[in-house]
Swiss-Prot record:
<dbReference type="GO" id="GO:0015629">
    <property type="term" value="C:actin cytoskeleton"/>
</dbReference>
<protein>
    <recommendedName>
        <fullName>Actin-like protein 10</fullName>
    </recommendedName>
</protein>
<dbReference type="InterPro" id="IPR043129">
    <property type="entry name" value="ATPase_NBD"/>
</dbReference>
<dbReference type="Pfam" id="PF00022">
    <property type="entry name" value="Actin"/>
</dbReference>
<dbReference type="InterPro" id="IPR004000">
    <property type="entry name" value="Actin"/>
</dbReference>
<comment type="similarity">
    <text>Belongs to the actin family.</text>
</comment>
Length: 245
């Protein structure tokens, strides 16, 4: 076992920075310094890929009531989300102006074809505005800022220089640009204008944790820290925290 945030950072060749993960089940903003996670400065958002897939289905049914009678497999909805959805850089403006909706038709199988309009950019928006789902949590950019803010002043700039995106839900077109824009706005709004976060958004970031894990496992320095089955049976799960924290 290892910190997914650390492995995401390692996939870029870094051992210090801020990992911003958005996967299927949850989002995290985790500061990493010298290979160690700062759990007290880690923030979690319970809105991620699976939540967005359910939200997209609700949006589709609301716009096309006839779909309620259709069997819409979860896999088909997830595929539709990945193919068609994107993050708006001006959500309120796009929502008000139908000319900016970019409607498109997509097949969801079983001979069923749906037309998406504003749903294309409304689907990922709860990661930035959880209130759209009735949740009181802050959006991911605010959590990323809080993670940096909670770190010692002497480390903030170094961590902000490497803000690594990881996870399949960061692959929406416009995601990196929106996060960058809002994270900078958070810094200015709270009096940290000198803090200039630099996002690292690699093309393979959907598999960043796996890639980082394969890289770390090949390091001789890491192999010396492997936990054997006998060690685990003797010490139990406490040993994981002693080794990896």
């Amino acid at each position: 076992m290892a910190s997914t945030a650390l492995l995401a950072l390692c996939s870029t060749g870094a051992f210090s920075g801020l990992a911003v993960e958005a996967g299927a089940g949850v989002c995290h903003a985790t500061p990493i310094y010298a290979g160690h996670s700062w759990h007290q400065a880690t923030f979690r958002l319970n809105v991620a890929g699976s939540t967005l897939s359910r939200y997209l289905r609700d949006l589709l049914v609301a716009a096309n009531p006839d779909l309620l009678q259709q069997a819409l497999p979860r896999k088909a909805i997830t595929h539709l989300k990945k193919r068609s959805c994107y993050v708006s850089l001006d959500f309120e403006g796009d929502l008000r102006d139908p000319a900016r909706h970019h409607p498109a038709s997509f097949s969801v199988g079983n001979g069923c074809c749906v037309c998406l309009s504003s749903e294309r950019f409304r689907c990922p928006e709860p990661i930035f505005q959880p209130g759209l789902l009735g949740q009181a949590e802050q959006g991911l950019p605010a959590l990323a800022f809080r993670a940096l803010q909670k770190m010692p002043k002497t480390l903030r700039t170094r961590l902000a220089d490497t803000v690594v995106l990881a996870g399949g839900s960061t692959l929406f077109p416009g995601f990196a640009e929106r996060l960058d824009k809002e994270l900078e706005a958070q810094c200015r709004r709270h009096g940290y204008a000198a803090l200039r976060p630099h996002l690292v958004a690699k093309h393979g970031r959907g598999m960043a944790v796996w890639t980082g894990g394969s890289m770390v496992a090949s390091l001789h320095s890491f192999q010396r820290r492997w936990i054997t089955r006998a060690m685990y049976q003797e010490c139990g799960s406490r040993l994981l925290y002693d080794v990896f924290n």
